[in-house]
Amino acid sequence: MPLSYQHFRKLLLLDDGTEAGPLEEELPRLADADLNRRVAEDLNLGNLNVSIPWTHKVGNFTGLYSSTVPIFNPEWQTPSFPNIHLQEDIINRCQQFVGPLTVNEKRRLKLIMPARFYPTHTKYLPLDKGIKPYYPDQVVNHYFQTRHYLHTLWKAGILYKRETTRSASFCGSPYSWEQELQHGRLVIKTSQRHGDESFCSQPSGILSRSSVGPCIRSQLKQSRLGLQPHQGPLASSQPGRSGSIRARVHPSTRRYFGVEPSGSGHIDHSVNNSSSCLHQSAVRKAAYSHLSTSKRQSSSGHAVEFHCLPPNSAGSQSQGSVSSCWWLQFRNSKPCSEYCLSHLVNLREDWGPCDEHGEHHIRIPRTPARVTGGVFLVDKNPHNTAESRLVVDFSQFSRGITRVSWPKFAVPNLQSLTNLLSSNLSWLSLDVSAAFYHIPLHPAAMPHLLIGSSGLSRYVARLSSNSRINNNQYGTMQNLHDSCSRQLYVSLMLLYKTYGWKLHLYSHPIVLGFRKIPMGVGLSPFLLAQFTSAICSVVRRAFPHCLAFSYMDDVVLGAKSVQHREALYTAVTNFLLSLGIHLNPNKTKRWGYSLNFMGYIIGSWGTLPQDHIVQKIKHCFRKLPVNRPIDWKVCQRIVGLLGFAAPFTQCGYPALMPLYACIQAKQAFTFSPTYKAFLSKQYMNLYPVARQRPGLCQVFADATPTGWGLAIGHQRMRGTFVAPLPIHTAELLAACFARSRSGAKLIGTDNSVVLSRKYTSFPWLLGCAANWILRGTSFVYVPSALNPADDPSRGRLGLYRPLLRLPFQPTTGRTSLYAVSPSVPSHLPVRVHFASPLHVAWRPP
């Protein structure tokens, strides 16, 4: 029996020299409220109101009033993203691989093809809030690093770029729902004056890069500024035409290309064909001599200028007037000091495009030039500080009026995980690179998930105290130099070494929407869990003699032998690659027979916490002060750590109840030396959580408030309590007696609280003792009417109810491991091919 009762009494200072009686007498005493109160006073557990100042730091745990200053690393590398494109016909591909899919798998895969996110309310924030001033001392560096990260994501096809209110561009391969289809092709009609030629029609409905300019641009709407001339060659099919074509287009939206906030006083995105800025040189003047340009000034001071160029002219590096671009204005202005930005701008002739456009353009719902969340950079993870990670804050969808309730999904609990994975298989884990960015998002969700930036000029102006943003005169010469400062100049000079001409590109405003699911939204983990669990379900059915399991982006494969595992690895890797799932082969880990997963080590003997967690716990106890009140926020962090390992201790969660109580009361907690010693002893020896075995229940327990009864095989026992007890307490005591009398690992009971194995609501001492006694016991529910122990508990020993045949099947929780599936047709070839086309990195020792 696991509990030495005297030992428990000594541990909790209950022993006053008297010899402990039998368990049936002693255990009910632990439920006594008076004894629990005395022990709490002895251990100083209940004294929450203290006058001594609280301690706000214990080891690495910080509590209230502590601000950890984030550290910015100017050397951060932006991680590279593979060209991730999940195959659209993923369901068909899975069916070719494994035969018909189950309803469950189909439903999950349809959820993510494409994912949809349509909240009822969305708050739009000004572009200035797009990049958070998370590092006040490194504003400019952080701005450019973040812009570079966003540019990388856009290039990798993870973001859309807002081009106009109703159109966006992106890179990478398009999905069918991203095409603008009109009878199977994209058709834009010009006005009657040019005849009814429909141009730019490509059967696929996807615009190629070469024709992108004119098509979208032909939709230039009539703005408040009056009619604008239209630019450029009509289509790639009519290369010779040049000159200015005034297209009469439908007056609907007021703004076209720029994303400059409407109050900022100028629209600075030129509408250009090859989307690049000109060389400010003689070439420019030569090329511009034969252009017809038109410039109109509006009452509000907006200047908008469009040019028309022959496609092959020398000036196809065209752009709007220099005056519309904050960066290039410095070229023609007099330096205001030795730290004037004009020195930097004059360093190179060609600053590249003001604006880049993607390979494909699509229609989107009306999208304002605003953001719905801010972004900033942090270390990729505590072990990798060389690379950065983008944090996207869409917290508006978790609070206030814009709150969205996220779908719940099952997380395997410790016992289910052990039942499932504790086996004598050889394991490896796969690393899915950028797992979230595999799942495509419908373009209609774009207006709700916007990130971006207002451009360097406004960002710097907003943060520097000496300059005001004046709506009516912003962008004019007198305050162009307001942003010049030594700090900005030095930062930009250093950044110029890294980014070169891209400094100009990144200094323009931009609005981006997500094309794949972002990490900062509660929907994403749910979708990722659905996706990987469906894929694993398919893999398990294709290889019934192996085990594949996933939690989020952590996928593990188990097989009987190492050779078998490697063959399985090859086959599964090929299958995942064919679906468009990107694996990182360098991060594939081969664990052998004990698997590291979700913070646990799982072997055939059961489950234990991983070593780094055990070390953290030891460190925590070393640093834990006694007789000093510890702030409840620190206690919360301590409980988080200890709670993870609690199932591996003898007393389990109930031992932490005094700490939980103080956190709930938001009071400080003082560790007495005895309580600290008790906890420390609990956590120094961790016992594995073993796998439950199926079996037949032979032992039953039942209780009434006044007595208890047991049925052990054909033997019946009964007893009475000294005083009536609450029914749940009585049932728990009966279960403890059944375990200690019979040693059975399987007990039948009709009480749901005992079945749940959560003993935190009982009197503290009883909860600890019961957890100790019942550790490793499995319970089976038996209805009261059929419970053989029912009669003995009511004091009737003469009546024998026949023993039930109650089989026990260990549960794997709601991890829906084996979706019930139609049988796989027998003519499918066996799928583990030993002669693999993929070379396995593993070599025999």
Swiss-Prot record:
Q: Looking at the record, which segments are called Disordered?
A: 226-245
**Catalytic reaction equation(s):** DNA(n) + a 2'-deoxyribonucleoside 5'-triphosphate = DNA(n+1) + diphosphate; Endonucleolytic cleavage to 5'-phosphomonoester
Its UniProt miscellaneous note says:
Hepadnaviral virions contain probably just one P protein molecule per particle.
Q: What is its EC number?
A: 2.7.7.7, 2.7.7.49, 3.1.26.4
Q: Which HAMAP family match?
A: HBV_DPOL
Which intervals of the chain are annotated as region Spacer?
Answer: 180-348
Name of the encoding gene:
P
Q: Which residues form the Reverse transcriptase domain?
A: 359-602
Which UniProt keywords are given for this protein, alphabetically ordered?
Answer: DNA replication, DNA-binding, DNA-directed DNA polymerase, Endonuclease, Host-virus interaction, Hydrolase, Inhibition of host innate immune response by virus, Inhibition of host RLR pathway by virus, Magnesium, Metal-binding, Multifunctional enzyme, Nuclease, Nucleotidyltransferase, RNA-directed DNA polymerase, Transferase, Viral immunoevasion
Region (Polymerase/reverse transcriptase domain (RT)), start-end ranges:
349-692
Q: Kindly give the PANTHER family that the UniProt entry links to this protein.
A: PEPTIDASE A2 DOMAIN-CONTAINING PROTEIN-RELATED (PTHR33064:SF29), POL PROTEIN (PTHR33064)
Recorded protein name is Protein P
Q: Which family is annotated?
A: Belongs to the hepadnaviridae P protein family.
Molecular function GO terms recorded: DNA binding; DNA-directed DNA polymerase activity; metal ion binding; RNA-directed DNA polymerase activity; RNA-DNA hybrid ribonuclease activity
- What switches its activity on or off, per the activity regulation note? Activated by host HSP70 and HSP40 in vitro to be able to bind the epsilon loop of the pgRNA. Because deletion of the RNase H region renders the protein partly chaperone-independent, the chaperones may be needed indirectly to relieve occlusion of the RNA-binding site by this domain. Inhibited by several reverse-transcriptase inhibitors: Lamivudine, Adefovir and Entecavir.
**Gene Ontology biological-process annotations:** DNA replication; symbiont-mediated suppression of host innate immune response
Q: What does this protein do?
A: Multifunctional enzyme that converts the viral RNA genome into dsDNA in viral cytoplasmic capsids. This enzyme displays a DNA polymerase activity that can copy either DNA or RNA templates, and a ribonuclease H (RNase H) activity that cleaves the RNA strand of RNA-DNA heteroduplexes in a partially processive 3'- to 5'-endonucleasic mode. Neo-synthesized pregenomic RNA (pgRNA) are encapsidated together with the P protein, and reverse-transcribed inside the nucleocapsid.
